[in-house]
């Protein structure tokens, strides 16, 4: 019986990766696999979602998962759910690892690897993904790119104290 379930998941995953219909066909196929998906969700072409345990993934209303993203919820015997909250945006080619919660209105930049949860309305980027800005307007239907960019507020890094060996010679 487990082999039949695995075959079904792999077959539906393959179909969802290749067929058109980012808000219709792909969403329906992933739901059939067991992924919990809200309304108004966009799933980009060639996206891979946890093959062995799709039931560990939740994508809430209005979220966007860009093309060629990978969402994993387990490694061997390590199983942790992944949740993508309302209006979150996962950029193309991003990788989300087990146990991550992407907060409401959060944005993951293209190509980022997310190893820790992302707070609501925060933009992260890099490998591993780090917070770089606060998001005023998440990039969803009806939001112009210019308005999204204008809404970003950089997160300033805390300045660290200079140690004695780093102070300039001759300064007082």
Q: What role is predicted for each listed range?
A:
Residues 2-49:
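Extended, small-residue-rich solenoid/repeat segments and analogous flexible loops
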Residues 14, 82-90, 95-96, 127-172:
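C-terminal segments of enzyme domains that contribute to small-molecule binding surfaces
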Residues 30-31, 35-37, 41-125, 129-131:
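Structural signal for interior beta-strand "rungs" in well-ordered beta-sheet cores
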């Amino acid at each position: 019986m487990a082999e039949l379930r695995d075959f079904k998941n792999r077959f539906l995953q393959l179909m969802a990766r290749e067929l058109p219909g980012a808000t219709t066909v792909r969403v329906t196929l992933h739901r059939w696999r067991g992924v919990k998906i809200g309304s108004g969700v966009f799933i980009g072409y060639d996206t891979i979602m946890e093959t062995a345990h799709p039931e560990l993934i939740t994508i809430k209303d209005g979220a966007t998962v860009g093309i060629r993203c990978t969402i994993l919820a387990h490694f061997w015997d390590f199983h942790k759910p992944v949740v993508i909250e309302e209006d979150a945006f996962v950029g193309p080619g991003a990788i989300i690892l087990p146990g991550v919660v992407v907060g409401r209105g959060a944005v993951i930049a293209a190509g980022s690897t997310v190893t820790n949860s992302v707070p609501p309305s925060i933009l992260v980027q890099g490998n591993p993904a780090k917070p770089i800005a606060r998001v005023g307007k998440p990039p969803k239907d009806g939001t112009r790119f210019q308005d999204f960019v204008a809404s970003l507020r950089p997160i300033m890094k805390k300045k660290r104290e200079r140690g004695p060996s780093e102070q300039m010679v001759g300064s007082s």
